[in-house]
Amino acid sequence: MSADKVTLADLPLRDNLRGKSPYGAPQLQVPVRLNTNENPHPPSKALVDDVAASVREAAAELHRYPDRDAVALRTDLAAYLTAATGVRLGVENLWAANGSNEILQQLLQAFGGPGRTAIGFVPSYSMHPIISDGTQTEWLQASRAEDFGLDIDVAVSAVTERKPDVVFVTSPNNPSGQSVPLDDLRRVLDAMQGGILIVDEAYGEFSSQPSAVALLDDY
């Protein structure tokens, strides 16, 4: 078989990945692109100059790996989130990776995997089940309310009955935009019998509710 005729179906993929469709967010030529969470305003000249200067400085060390723990970045992120949420956070509370999808994958590699389950409340962010499949974590789901907000009674019942190892709650929800109150997150946490709750706050700057980091000291 010549290389130019090889298709994805010819490759030795895992059986559970065959027939799956890749994730993709449409790249639309419109001023506001909330589907990809992009800032509609271009960076200022001062910011561009600052980034260029920082890249030039870092380029002198391109022959070395960067800090694998990203301590400087995590320090700055902790300061930003402390100011944004009012909850004191330190480097130990933060992890950094190449986008939130990589973080989600790392979480499921650590806390999901074969023989474990993850649950989400749909419709919600489509990457949650895709990453679950990719990490061989069995995907479970429960429905949201008619307005696509989180039906907390349904969520608590699903968590209690199905005992998932990982629970996904998106706040604000993607794509419908509703935020989840802290009291509802407490109910989910209290219903869990082990495992971890992942509150996906990718659109946190648009939230109408406090960040879930406010619950760290209690749980």
Curated annotation (Swiss-Prot):
Pfam families: Aminotran_1_2. GO terms for molecular function: histidinol-phosphate transaminase activity; pyridoxal phosphate binding. It comes from the Bacteria. Its EC number is 2.6.1.9. Its cofactor is pyridoxal 5'-phosphate. Pathway: Amino-acid biosynthesis; L-histidine biosynthesis; L-histidine from 5-phospho-alpha-D-ribose 1-diphosphate: step 7/9. Keywords: Amino-acid biosynthesis, Aminotransferase, Histidine biosynthesis, Pyridoxal phosphate, Transferase. This is Histidinol-phosphate aminotransferase. It comes from Mycolicibacterium smegmatis.
